[in-house]
Amino acid sequence: MKNSSNKYLDLPYRPGVGMMILNADNQIFVGKRIDTKISAWQMPQGGIVPGETPSIAAMREMLEEIGSNKGYIIAESKCWYSYDVPSFLIPKLWNGNFRGQKQRWFLIRFTGNNKDINIHTSNPEFDQWRWTSLDELLSIIIPFKRKLYQAVVKEFESLIQ
């Protein structure tokens, strides 16, 4: 979704990673964001620390957001995907320095158990979590990320077996 306010179009995208985390039943991890009153479900994502590779960032973010990094990378996206946040959110996120995010996405096989997942981390981003199907994923995602998620699903779909 493109930004409706031109004053933000010159801002860069924040470099980050996203993770499509699969359990043994090929269900996808989603968390409900803690910082909004609306039902905003998403897959884990986060920023890349300077000097960090995207794959290292993905595993670090997995640990930070779901309390476990038990898993392995199946695939990395072939390109960077980007999204713009709604203009009213820009001043509230990342000190207003970015218009959205550009992300490398990773398909990750979770090798732990549900009891290994702990979203009550030192800086929690989610207040609920669940496993969802590929079919349901796009219908529960916050709308401004839907186009990006469609592209990620299209790229990884054939690898989810």
From Swiss-Prot:
InterPro entries hit by this protein: NUDIX_hydrolase-like_dom_sf (IPR015797), NUDIX_hydrolase_CS (IPR020084), NUDIX_hydrolase_dom (IPR000086), RppH (IPR022927)
SUPFAM superfamilies xrefs: Nudix
GO molecular function, one term: mRNA 5'-diphosphatase activity
EC number per UniProt: 3.6.1.-
Natural source organism: Rickettsia typhi (strain ATCC VR-144 / Wilmington)
Domain Nudix hydrolase: residue ranges: 12-154
Keywords: Hydrolase
Gene: rppH
Family: Belongs to the Nudix hydrolase family. RppH subfamily.
Domain of life: Bacteria
GO cellular component: cytoplasm
Function: Accelerates the degradation of transcripts by removing pyrophosphate from the 5'-end of triphosphorylated RNA, leading to a more labile monophosphorylated state that can stimulate subsequent ribonuclease cleavage.
Disulfide-linked positions: none
Motif Nudix box per UniProt: ranges: 46-67
Cofactor(s) this protein cannot do without: a divalent metal cation
Name assigned to this protein: RNA pyrophosphohydrolase
